Amino acid sequence: MQVNIGFFPQYDHEVGIRTVIKPGFDSSVLRLGQWKILSVKIDGNPKHCYIDPRQGAIGCFEEACRNVVCTGATPMGKVDHLQFGNPEDPEIFWTFMESIEGITDFAKFLNVPCVGG
C-alpha cells in the first residue's frame, strides 16, 4: 500500500496535543478528554472505483473499517465525501448510483450508519 507521506506535513495534526497515534498508515487515534478516544481513517482507491464502482466503494469502506479495527477500535459510523462529475451524463450517473448502492449495502451489512457526507 502506498502512503502519501507528502500530505501529512501540510497540516498540524498535533494541535491541542490530542494525537495518540499519528496519521500515515492505519487509522489515527485522538484523545477526546481523559477517558475517551476516537479512531479516524480516510480512505480511497480511484483505480478500483474506476474499474468497478460498486466494489471499489465497498473496498474503500472496508479498508477504512479494517484500519480502525487495527487500532483496537470498533467502527461506529462513517462520513462520506463523494465526488463525481455531471450527474446528467448517464455514465457518470451510473457510477454514482453503483457507488452509493455498494456503500449502502456494506454499511447495512456492518451495521455502521452514515452520519454525514
Q: Which residues make up each language-model segment?
A:
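Glycine/proline-enriched, intrinsically flexible loops and inter-domain linkers
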Residues: M1-G117
